[in-house]
């Protein structure tokens, strides 16, 4: 019998993942790479994440729409793994259009993405308040409760906005249960079912032009040879399965989540770029072994403008942690590293790197995956010489001053993954790309 020849996957999809606690600078990398890709996909999270993009003397924060929207010709997709606040989405579309960029025909939203409703936001705040000292540090945007409904099989999806009868039935069913909680447990005012039905029934005509089966769309585009860039929100150490549980987000920012959150098959993924901030930050509660509580930590916060793009909250700051990074690179299968915010370290006489932990008097090199153990470790540091000068002019590694270049190559050697991108300033052009 004659053997048949079948086409093989093109492996033209690239995944960008945060390797730390989020806020690594993924937005700049996506913005920088977007003109090299046909499609950019957001695959998980919601409006709890903020990607800051700096270009043309403007600084723009996006929470839902992929950063590629600012590159003409680039198509943007919000995947099935994202939870969407319809009000926030429409506000963001309006903001992008006011900046002079077309959105219709360039933005597609998965019909299977779940919605964040007003009662999710209230539940988020009430749940957090009830935790007392054990608060997670949620943004209060309703992300967790929306994912709870999704996995309880009670969620309302984007496609339901297009069917008024279905939407009304699901809203009534959900509010019957939620209002009991508000009334009997939290002693709060109930939501008006009729008002919510009326308000959300108006979204069908507005959102309809953007809604499609993005799983099929992406599969067909990949088979046609198109290139796809997948961007996650938050970071590996906040992943609900692989992060510092329970101080985590409610989804999977890891590279595996890129496939489930977009519908793209794994064999289309050619490379995984891990975004690494040159130091570390964390928002909210949870263990942070290399956190600094002194003037150095304050300096990192001040120079790095480390305040949440979504909440405005001050971020906790510390030195880069190679133990955590090795774990993240392994979990995500990272093939190359994008090093960001190197410029924040420009004024430090010395820079420290956490190379291992001490636990109960013993040195360990593996990242503890249970939070009680992680909270007991202390960092072991290696001190490197600072460079005390700007590298904003650099466009190649050779353009950088020797000490900054040594810092990059030290990380590369320790992590055994090539550093192919170095951000030496906030601007799109302030980039070393190897």
Curated annotation (Swiss-Prot):
Q: Which residues bind substrate per the record?
A: 309-315
Q: In which pathway does it act?
A: Purine metabolism; AMP biosynthesis via de novo pathway; AMP from IMP: step 1/2
Q: Where is the active site?
A: 23, 51
- Which residues are noted in the entry as Mg(2+)-binding? 23, 50
Q: Which residues are noted in the entry as GTP-binding?
A: 22-28, 50-52, 315, 341-343, 423-425
User: Which GO annotations describe the biological process of this protein?
Assistant: 'de novo' AMP biosynthetic process; IMP metabolic process
**Task of the protein:** Plays an important role in the de novo pathway of purine nucleotide biosynthesis. Catalyzes the first committed step in the biosynthesis of AMP from IMP.
Q: How does it assemble?
A: Homodimer.
The name this protein carries in UniProt is Adenylosuccinate synthetase
Q: Identify the species of origin.
A: Chlorobium limicola (strain DSM 245 / NBRC 103803 / 6330)
């Amino acid at each position: 019998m004659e053997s048949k020849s079948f086409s093989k996957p093109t492996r033209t999809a690239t995944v960008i993942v945060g390797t730390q606690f989020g806020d690594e600078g993924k937005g700049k990398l996506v913005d920088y790479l977007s003109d090299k890709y046909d499609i950019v996909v957001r695959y998980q999270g919601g409006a709890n994440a903020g990607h800051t993009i700096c270009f043309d003397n403007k600084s723009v924060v996006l929470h839902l729409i992929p950063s590629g929207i600012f590159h003409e010709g680039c198509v943007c997709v919000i995947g099935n793994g994202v939870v969407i606040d319809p009000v926030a989405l429409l506000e963001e579309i309006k903001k992008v259009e006011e900046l002079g960029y077309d959105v219709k025909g360039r933005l597609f939203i998965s019909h299977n993405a779940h919605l964040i409703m007003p009662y999710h936001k209230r539940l988020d705040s009430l749940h957090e308040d009830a935790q007392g000292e054990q608060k997670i540090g949620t943004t209060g945007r309703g992300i967790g409760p929306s994912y709870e409904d999704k996995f309880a099989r009670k969620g309302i999806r984007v496609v339901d906005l297009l069917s008024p009868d279905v939407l009304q039935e699901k809203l009534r069913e959900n509010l019957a249960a939620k209002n009991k909680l508000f009334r009997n447990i939290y002693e709060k005012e109930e939501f008006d079912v009729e008002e919510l039905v009326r308000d959300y029934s108006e979204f069908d005509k507005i959102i309809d032009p953007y809604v499609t089966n993005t799983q099929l769309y992406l599969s067909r585009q990949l088979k046609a040879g198109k290139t796809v860039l997948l961007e996650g929100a938050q970071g590996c150490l906040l992943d609900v399965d692989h992060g510092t549980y329970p101080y985590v987000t409610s989804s999977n920012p890891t590279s595996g989540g890129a496939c489930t959150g977009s519908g793209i098959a794994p064999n289309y993924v050619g490379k995984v770029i891990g975004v690494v901030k040159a130091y570390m930050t964390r928002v909210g509660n949870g263990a942070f072994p290399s956190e600094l509580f002194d003037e150095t930590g304050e300096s990192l916060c001040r120079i790095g403008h480390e305040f949440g793009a979504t909440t405005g909250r001050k971020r906790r700051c510390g030195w880069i942690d190679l133990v955590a990074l090795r774990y993240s690179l392994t979990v995500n299968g990272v093939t190359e590293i994008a090093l960001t915010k190197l410029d924040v370290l420009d004024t430090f006489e010395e820079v420290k790197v956490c190379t291992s932990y001490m636990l109960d008097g013993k040195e360990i090199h593996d990242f503890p995956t249970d939070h009680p153990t992680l909270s007991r470790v202390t960092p072991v540091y290696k001190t490197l010489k600072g460079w005390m000068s700007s590298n904003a002019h650099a466009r190649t590694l050779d353009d950088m001053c020797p000490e900054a270049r040594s810092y990059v190559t030290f990380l590369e050697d320790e992590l055994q993954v090539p550093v192919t991108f170095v951000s030496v300033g906030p601007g799109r052009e302030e980039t070393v790309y190897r």
